[in-house]
Amino acid sequence: MQSNLLAVLFALASALTIAWGTVVRHRIALRTPKDGSLRSSPLLNALMTPMWWAGMSTAMLAYFLQTVALGFGTLLVVQPVLVLSLMFTLPLSARFNGYRLRRTEIFWATLLTVAVGIMIVLGRPLPGNPHPPLDRWIPVLLVGVAVMGGMWLLAEYVLKKDKALILGLVTGALFGYVAVMSKAAVDLFVHQGITGLILNWEGYGLILTALLGTIVQQYSFNAGELQKSLPAMTIAEPIVAFSLGYLVLGEKFQVVDWEWIAMGIALLVMIVSTIALSRTSTMPAGSKR
């Protein structure tokens, strides 16, 4: 059953739960020692922390709500709504870490959210192919592996100062792939039942990509302040998901003439807002405890 209203409501609930889980896992990352020992591994340190598992449980609930939303609406409807998690995460992070958001941060975060909202309201997305052929998937998967692998190497060995930002982009891109695979898996389940999920590769690819995204996300949290990595994740995920929704699933925006200009401006505002947020840091050093 297609219902954009239900899709938006479930996506909004997902955004709310994403925010809390993100803040919890980032606080754990800030407590991780950076002495090069095995104990300093962001992933191992997180796995040994009960609150991380609480945060992950919240993240799983958020993902379940996102999946339900995808059952009611297209990827191009659900994905932009999830960017609202940024509006909830930044104030929560400020509250838990004992600092105050600047007006400029609030301005850019609001502008980012408004821009994404314009894209969904003006775009009026149409559904695509519920089960695209494999030859549509292979090129985008190969390109994704090459680009994200290259970005990881840059963050590790070349652009260490911007490691949190770059890993945030990689995380967002991975979850963009997760979003598309989620939509494909949901459509498989709706049309073919559990047998369709078992006999097709999309469900297994979804699990693998989601696991990889969670690991990279924890490393991005450990690499720096939340204001560095979170905006990058927030902007990369819908852009990658939009692109794959067009290329793989065949979903389309109902946009004509001047509306394309408005959509382009909204996309530009999204990018500028993300850069502005990623370059702003209000968390005092003393809060990293």
From Swiss-Prot:
Q: Tell me a GO cellular component.
A: plasma membrane
Span-the-membrane segments of this chain are 4-24, 44-64, 68-88, 106-126, 138-158, 166-186, 196-216, 230-250, 258-278
Instruction: Report how it sits in the membrane.
Output: Multi-pass membrane protein
Q: Where in the cell is it found?
A: Cell membrane
Mainly resides where?
membrane
Keyword Acetylation part of the UniProt annotation: no
Give the domain of life.
Bacteria
| Entry keywords, A to Z | Cell membrane, Membrane, Transmembrane, Transmembrane helix
Under what name is this protein listed?
Answer: Uncharacterized protein Cgl0250/cg0304
Q: What is the lineage of its organism?
A: Bacteria, Bacillati, Actinomycetota, Actinomycetes, Mycobacteriales
